[in-house]
Amino acid sequence: MAFKDNAVELEERVVAVNRVTKVVKGGRRLRFAALVVVGDHNGRVGFGTGKAQEVPEAIRKAVDDAKKNLIEVPMVGTTIPHEVLSEFGGAKVLLKPAVEGSGVAAGGAVRAVVELAGVADITSKSLGSNTPINIVRATVEGLKQLKRAEEIAALRGISVSDLA
């Protein structure tokens, strides 16, 4: 789900920059691939990739791509509503809600995504592959799976108090 109103300032964080080569008849063609996460620290986050012959241009393309792929993250206070395990490729990411004041217990790429989403208290574990792009994609997939208690109650046709 893309958001059109860019009135809110989005913070950008470069997660990875890779040097990639393409072997051609005359030798090797060098380019740079960038992975960037953007978020407003208020429940909106997105990631994007860009490739170019210069690093700044690759980052600019990645930022533009990330702004087109923003998602809304449901939150309960400063954490997520429930535990979620998501996979992408060989990467698995486990996201668990944490009590207020715990902080962000997450490494590398997962930390970038959840901090820019505005989640202040969360515990996470990355399992399997630790490739940054797959970790970011798995984290975003996990955040997409989250549902508030009100949404679950509405789907089941019961009141929120009957969920417990």
From Swiss-Prot:
From the Swiss-Prot or TrEMBL record, what is one GO molecular function term?
A: structural constituent of ribosome
Biological process per Gene Ontology, one example term: translation
Question: What residues does the S5 DRBM domain cover?
Answer: 10-73
Q: Which family does it belong to?
A: Belongs to the universal ribosomal protein uS5 family.
What note about domains is in the entry? The N-terminal domain interacts with the head of the 30S subunit; the C-terminal domain interacts with the body and contacts protein S4. The interaction surface between S4 and S5 is involved in control of translational fidelity.
What job does this protein perform?
Answer: With S4 and S12 plays an important role in translational accuracy.
Query: What is its quaternary makeup?
Result: Part of the 30S ribosomal subunit. Contacts proteins S4 and S8.
Instruction: Tell me what this protein is called.
Output: Small ribosomal subunit protein uS5
- Organismal lineage: Bacteria, Bacillati, Bacillota, Bacilli, Lactobacillales
